[in-house]
């Protein structure tokens, strides 16, 4: 194991201040009127097989098919866990958020597993239990985590039924249930049309209407309360990507869809204006999948819904955002950590490969292959978009030669830190 010296020295750098820069990269691509003509309606942009296309799913899933079925089988007899009022109140009373998040998260994991299992098998074996999960979620007063419910107007911990909170959790559930509606509406209607009718209603109220009409959420970076240059983090691309996929899967009125898409562009532009042009992730390497990674998800979806006409992957800033994760890796499972990021990691191999493909980075593709040694079936929990997107490139990733060339010097002048290394890093395997 060779010695590596990695220096992160924000405090030793010249004290140059790099402020908010109004780049507005996305809005420079198009205006609202031109955007309307670009949009692909009626889910014609979806390239995945319909649920009933069994040969299509067998081909798409390949050797991963059985893994999804086995995961779903674990939940065939799952007992859905009630999240009690006192579980929400615990956050206000004692600061305990896990008492609410643990059962809530397990329920959400069950829905995701059942959804993917039924897509994989296609025999209806998982549908009833999937319906149970869908209806269970529809009956909840809120899809937000207890720690975030306080964003509602009352600022209290118990959810208000008429004031939906759009946080990371609500957006993630919106993503998952929008795909559920898209793939299984016809199957649900054969059981009882009320299932899909109720699901569509809850998605409209909690996700679509809330995004369009409530600008009170800080991550949106809009409204009279927002001041340009105020701190924005991974919540912005993460929540906006979830909002965008919901609109893409559910909204087919051209004017409404254009309004929503353009609102996401304005919001994500504020994030891209806030972060530094050098591409470093200020939140640390373990947040890369949530900040640059969710920016990738968002930009891919935006390109898809506009038929490739709104595409900023050629921007050097975007490529630098992607390559930050490979530059942070020093070998043997270690990364250069700071803030509250972990020192162990390297990232989601499929996400890294997708980023490399989008920005044409052989560095990222080779690094993704290095991170993909286990070669397990792609799984991103209730982030169905990311699981499906990972499956699309799974074979390409498996055929890519692993490689991580340790860069001797990477300087991030605006974020003000630098990576310096000697020789080959901690693990010789990382340089192959």
Name the predicted role of every residue range:
Residues 1-4, 295:
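Positively charged n-region of N-terminal signal peptides that target proteins for export
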Residues 4-13:
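Sec-dependent N-terminal signal peptides
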Residues 20-92:
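Low-complexity, Ser/Thr/Pro/Gly-enriched N-terminal "stalk/linker" regions
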Residues 72-84, 130-148, 197-223, 259-279, ...:
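Long, well-ordered core segments of solenoidal/helical folds
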Residues 88-99, 149-168, 220-234, 242, ...:
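Carbohydrate-binding/catalytic loop surfaces
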Residues 109-124, 161, 172-191, 239-254, ...:
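Well-ordered alpha-helical scaffold segments within catalytic/enzyme domains
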Residues 156-286, 297, 392-406:
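Active-site lining segments of carbohydrate-active enzymes
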Residues 292-432:
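Carbohydrate-active enzyme catalytic cores, enriched for enzymes
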């Amino acid at each position: 194991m060779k010695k590596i010296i990695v220096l992160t020295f924000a405090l030793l750098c010249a004290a140059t201040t790099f402020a908010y820069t109004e780049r507005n990269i996305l809005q420079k691509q198009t205006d609202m009127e031109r955007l309307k003509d670009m949009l692909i309606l009626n889910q014609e942009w979806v390239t995945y097989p319909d649920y009933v296309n069994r040969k299509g799913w067998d081909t798409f899933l390949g050797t991963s098919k059985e893994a999804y079925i086995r995961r779903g089988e674990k939940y065939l007899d799952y007992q859905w866990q009630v999240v009690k009022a006192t579980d929400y109140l615990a956050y206000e009373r004692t600061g305990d958020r896990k008492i609410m998040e643990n059962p809530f998260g397990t329920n959400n994991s069950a829905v995701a597993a059942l959804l993917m299992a039924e897509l994989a098998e296609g025999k209806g074996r998982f549908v009833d239990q999937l319906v149970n999960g869908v209806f269970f979620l529809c009956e909840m007063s809120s899809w937000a985590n207890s720690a975030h419910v306080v964003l509602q107007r009352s600022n209290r911990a118990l959810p208000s039924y008429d004031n939906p909170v759009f946080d990371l959790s609500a957006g993630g559930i919106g993503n998952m249930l929008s795909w559920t509606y898209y793939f299984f509406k016809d199957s649900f209607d054969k059981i009882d049309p009320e299932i899909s009718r109720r699901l569509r209603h809850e998605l409209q109220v909690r996700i679509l209407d809330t995004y369009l009409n409530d600008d009170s959420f800080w991550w949106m970076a809009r409204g009279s309360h927002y001041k340009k240059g105020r701190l924005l983090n991974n919540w912005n691309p993460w929540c906006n990507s979830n909002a965008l996929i919901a609109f893409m899967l559910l909204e087919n009125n051209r004017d409404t869809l254009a309004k929503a898409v353009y609102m996401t562009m304005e919001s994500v532009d504020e994030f891209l204006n806030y972060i530094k042009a050098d591409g470093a992730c200020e939140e640390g390497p373990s947040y890369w999948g949530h900040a640059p990674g969710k920016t990738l998800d968002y930009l891919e979806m935006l390109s898809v819904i506009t038929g490739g006409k709104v595409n900023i992957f050629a921007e050097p800033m975007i490529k630098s955002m992607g390559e930050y994760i490979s530059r942070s890796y020093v070998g043997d499972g270690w990364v250069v950590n700071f803030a509250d990021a972990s020192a162990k990691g390297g990232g989601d191999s499929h996400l890294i490969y997708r980023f490399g493909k989008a920005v044409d980075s052989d560095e990222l593709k080779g690094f993704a292959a290095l991170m993909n040694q286990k070669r397990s079936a792609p799984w991103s929990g209730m982030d169905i978009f990311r699981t499906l997107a990972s499956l699309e490139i799974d074979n390409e990733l498996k055929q890519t030669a692993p490689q991580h060339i340790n860069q001797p010097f990477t300087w991030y002048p605006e974020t003000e830190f630098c990576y310096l290394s000697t020789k080959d890093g901690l693990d010789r395997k990382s340089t192959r």
